[in-house]
């Protein structure tokens, strides 16, 4: 099982990249799971805090507060541990797991320490001005991976079609990203 930890700022196209990559891998007869660290966080916020599911300013602050300020502050490996536990329960279910919301170094290192083949991909959208307020932009969930080593950089500066065309899947799941590092 190869795990792609996909990082990048909010709005840079992490989910879009993951979905395109998933489709390309599936076209190569690979079994793919797209799994977010925040899937459980969102469920908790809906059930425990009556969150309406909107990632507006209030919703994003709630997600950051519960996910980082409360849970990560007490148990830094809670989210990645949950994902690793699920993957350990189903070791032969998927060839590739794509995690499009990697935000902290431990979310990469924990999986490596558990023996997973981890590829860290950073999605960058040059010149994109985030609509988030300054507090949200400076939150550790947006900045913790700034300068952290990556295996590949994906530049998402055009259309979805441009992004799709820049990703080539070759040799049973090995990907190449145009103008980037091969993964």
Can you describe what each PLM-predicted range is?
Residues 9:
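P-loop (Walker A) phosphate-binding loop of NTP-binding proteins
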Residues 23-33:
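Post-Walker A helix-loop "phosphate-sensing" segment adjacent to the P-loop in P-loop NTPases
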């Amino acid at each position: 099982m190869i795990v792609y930890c996909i990082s990048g700022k909010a709005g840079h196209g992490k989910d879009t990249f993951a979905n395109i990559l998933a489709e390309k891998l599936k076209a190569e007869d690979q079994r793919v799971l797209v799994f977010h660290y925040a899937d459980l966080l969102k469920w908790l916020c809906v059930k425990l805090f009556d969150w309406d599911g909107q990632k507006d300013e209030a919703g994003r602050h709630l997600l950051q507060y519960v996910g980082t300020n409360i849970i990560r502050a007490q148990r830094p490996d809670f989210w990645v541990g949950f994902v690793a536990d699920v993957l350990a329960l189903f070791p032969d279910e998927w060839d590739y797991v794509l995690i499009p919301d990697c935000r902290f170094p431990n979310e990469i290192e924990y999986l490596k320490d558990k023996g997973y083949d981890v590829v860290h991909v950073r999605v960058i959208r040059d010149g994109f001005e985030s609509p988030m307020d300054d507090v949200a932009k400076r939150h550790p969930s947006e900045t913790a991976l700034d300068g952290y080593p990556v295996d590949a950089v994906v530049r998402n500066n055009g259309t979805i079609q441009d992004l799709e065309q820049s990703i080539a899947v070759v040799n049973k799941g090995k990907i190449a990203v145009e103008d980037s590092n091969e993964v």
